[in-house]
Structures are given as C-alpha cells and as structure tokens.
Amino acid sequence: MKKCVLLTSLAIMTFATIGVQAATLSTSKNIELLVVDGKKVESSYWSPTESVELADGKHQIVVRFDGEVKNGSKNTIYTTRPYLFDLNVADKDAKIVLPTLTTLSQTTAYFDRGADWALEYTDGSKEVLKTVELKGDGFGSFSNMEKLVAKYNSKHGIVFEQGYAVDLQEVAVKVDEQGKVQITGDSLTQLKMWYTKASAKEKKAFKIWAAEHDFN
C-alpha cells in the first residue's frame, strides 16, 4: 500500500514537472534587462541580472544597450532608449544579441539607422526581433521603467493574464483583407480593451456607473 502511494506521488510530481515548461532568456554583453511582463527586473551596477526563467507562452520584454565604447583615446558610456518586444517561449533557451559595438561612432550610427535586435538559440539559429523603441516625455521619463511600460501598454490595450502578455486589441478587433473592422471576442475581453484605453477621468466615471448598477 505504501509502495502504491509512493509511486502515485512520484507520478504526480513527474506530471507536474513535465506540465510546467520553461526556458532561460539571457543577454549578451552590454544588454540590460529592464522589464519583464510589466515588472521591473531587479538589478544593480555591481550585480546585473543577466537571465530570467520564463514559462511557455507570450511574454513582453524590455531591454536597452548600456555599455562602454571607445571615443577616440577615451572610454565613454553609451546608453540607448529602452526597446520593447514580444517573445513566444516554447521550452527553448535563447539569448538576446547585438553585433559587437566597440566605438562611439559605430554604436551611434548603428542605433540611428535602426538596430536589429535578435534572439540566438542554443542550436546556433537566430531570429530577428520586431522591437518598439520607447520614447518618454522629458529627461526623467526613463527613471521609472515600470511606469513607462504601463503607459505604453495602456495606450495599446495590452494586459497581463495569468502572467502572460495579451494584446486585447488583437483578440477583440479583427481586420479583414478589405480593411473592414469587426469586433470579436467575448464581452469581458472587449470591456478590458476599452478600459485600458480610457483616461483616468473616464475610468472613474465608469467605476461610479458600475457601482450604481446591480449586476447580481
């Protein structure tokens, strides 16, 4: 009986381990992980976070280049704006990579013409990432990365459901080849999409309206 219980427990543990697939996302030299799925990546100058474990599914990643490059006979620190991209994890380790950048002129020219961020997998294959360069208002706009990303997500109808990035506009709005727009998805998805796009004043008005109605 005890043997049966033990075998059953081991089977459950094995099933649970298999069911939760994950992959490691790491960064190459001078690439800084800033935000993962809307949450700031805790890091420091002396102890930067160079990798994260991600469960299978769609994730939102924000990174930037932050490294020392040559400027004539001197060294200088070059830091870019944050870049945001979506990543579909399928139990496959990957590294975020850029070409080797050594001088200030080379680095500036590379990012000015549009950087090609890529994922490099353990088998040597690469995938070019579709990134968005985040832009803030004023010098201090990049001091709070979570807030900057939240503002972007609110504007574009992106939320996180059970830890995964979901573009509500893609889920709730369908555009055919003729450009005809069709509202799809269930009512809850549509409500979430419009709520994320609402202003603070509109959200407050909606909450008051909802409180005044009996939905039981």
UniProtKB/Swiss-Prot annotation:
Key word Flavoprotein present: no
Keyword Signal among record annotations: yes
InterPro entries hit by this protein: UPF0319
N-terminal signal peptide: 1-22
Keywords: Signal
Transmembrane annotation, as ranges: none
Family membership noted in the UniProt record: Belongs to the UPF0319 family.
PANTHER family: UPF0319 PROTEIN YCCT
Protein name: UPF0319 protein PBPRA1013
